[in-house]
Amino acid sequence: MVRITQYNVLCAKLASKARFPKCHEKALDPSSRLTSILNKLEGEIKQNSVICLQELGREWHGDFHDFFQKRKYYMIYSSYGSWKSDYMGVAIAYPMEKYTSENTQIVRISDNVPKVPSPSPVSWWYSYFNNLLIKFNLMSKLSYNEWLESSYKANTCIMTTLSSIDNPSEKFVVSTYHMPCSFYHPKVMTIHVVELLKAVHKYAEESP
């Protein structure tokens, strides 16, 4: 039986008292959080789980790499964030004594978002100032262009095919993704869900 688990580790840089004022300080301490998270993953490793991670930032990337390597796990990692999110990304880790990976692909989902027609110079400037007004809450968000915003998101999806070492004919597809945090514009997230499902479905269909 294949066991797959996923965990959003919450990028260390984003776990601040300002964002989580009701949390105990120890719960926000990067060192304490890292220890707690790795302890949780130990239980999954004992079960030979395939582990999918989201919001893994640069500060912890090396720690997770060493953690998995010492336990004979291989980690596939993709970073897409900016300095504001510590260049966070997503990862898939699997036990090397149980599986091998093939046809691994890393896809920027926004590359598949249908492109809006190129604006004229006048409409470009209108859109530019319109977005500024929205940003500073000087205009209704009803005029927000979800399709254009969706095409700007850098979030990447990892897709890989794992095959059993004991029985190479047994193969399955694993993918992981972190949705853009556009909570005030849910249509952006809906667009990404649709494009994500299309990308994973296409990958699975084309996998041997």
Each model region followed by its residue ranges:
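A long, amphipathic alpha-helix that forms part
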Residues: 184-208
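Glycine-rich loops and low-complexity Gly/Arg-rich segments
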Residues: 28-33, 75-79, 101-102, 116-119, ...
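Surface-exposed beta-strand edges and their flanking turn/coil or helix-capping segments
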Residues: 18-19, 50, 116-119, 187-190
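N-terminal, active-site-proximal structural segment of metallo-dependent hydrolase catalytic domains
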Residues: 1-70, 80-90, 125, 131-133, ...
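Feature marks short, surface-exposed loop/turn motifs that line or immediately flank catalytic pockets
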Residues: 11-13, 180-183
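Alpha-helix termini
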Residues: 43-47, 97, 163-168, 201-208
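Structured beta-strand-rich core segments of catalytic domains in phosphoester-bond hydrolases
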Residues: 50-180
